[in-house]
Amino acid sequence: MSEPTTRLPAPRRDRDGVRRRVRCRAFALLAVIAPGTAPAGPGGFWLNVWPFPTVVVSAFLISWAAECAQFLVSQGMALAILAWLQALPEFAVEAVIAWSQQIHYMTANFTGSLRLLVGLGWPLIFGVAAFSRWTRDRRLLTRIHLDGEHSVEVLALGLPILYFLIIYFKGTLTLVDGAVLMAIYILYLWVLKKVPPRETEEMEDLEAIPRRIMRLPRRGQILAITLLFAGGGLLLYLAAEPFLHSMLRFAVYFGVSEYLFIQWVAPFLSEFPEKLSAMYWARRPEKASMALMNMVSANINQWTMLAAMIPIVYSFSVGFPTHIPFDSFQRAEILLTVAQSMLGMLLLSNMSFHIVEAGGIFLLWGLQFARPHLHTEVTIIYFAWVAYEVFVTLVVRRRLAAFGAFMHVWRAHAVRARSVPAPNR
């Protein structure tokens, strides 16, 4: 008789990996199922719960598509496409509010969405990446380093923020402002088009499904990426409205005020796909910069195209071309949002994101969320921090790292492309 084989214990790293996967799947299952246990509307449990797994699946599909697309176009362009698909719920919510001509809610939703992206989204990415690094290597992650090509997104974020200072001082959002903001976004896409795709050597760092797609022939890659983008976008489109309605029942049940829902709950839910994609990448610290740029791309999208859409929809609703006037409270909301995003842009202009910066941004967001009456004080703190960063950049470092990185990328790709002679026919 043969001797019974002895089963060797799995290596500690494998056991830790299994436990981590079990925890992640259990958490995902809880996140998907838990909403259905809330006070259900008409139709029963499954009719109320289906939007949640659908949104999760759509987020994974478009994340895989973007991860593959960065080898066919630039990573920034892939993330710009991703941001458009992910922003569909937010655009839908803002369009409905603009059509109903509720200016105070327009501003609340728009500014709340942007402040959530920076104040909660960016630190959340850092937190997930740091937790992943600690559980895997028992090392503290102190900084997320950006790639040189990410300077395009960082500098592009500054343009609409500066223009919104003009909007703040004049107190109106006009169709001309919308045209300027759209022009900024088109310029941003034009620059991204000049940046080349990622090197093929980096494909080995992909997850299993994107890696298999990139092993297909070129036509197969394009077809698979197109299907993933289209399928994920379609699922997101179908689930967006039921998803928001399900969460609205949560808000009503827990007594959340309508204004609070419009400013914080609705943007959080409409940005849920963006957060899912970013967390998917952030769990691998080496991909944390891509996760961060996913959020930055969403910021650019909302500062430009979302803001440009508002006066257009509002004018159609009124029946003639007009502008949106802001009162003192709405202008204060805009100024606070500008200050926060300006600070975020300056912090990333060093081509890295430090743990102290992530913590500071999160604490300031939490302060103005928990204590709305400290609105003015938080705005002053933001601008004081902005002034400090400008002083350090101009006097101490005497250079803007993002600008230097951008010029290197521009000379390496855009200028070189113009200098290469066209092939003889």
Predicted regions: what is each one?
Residues 2-425:
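Hydrophobic alpha-helical segments, chiefly the membrane-spanning helices
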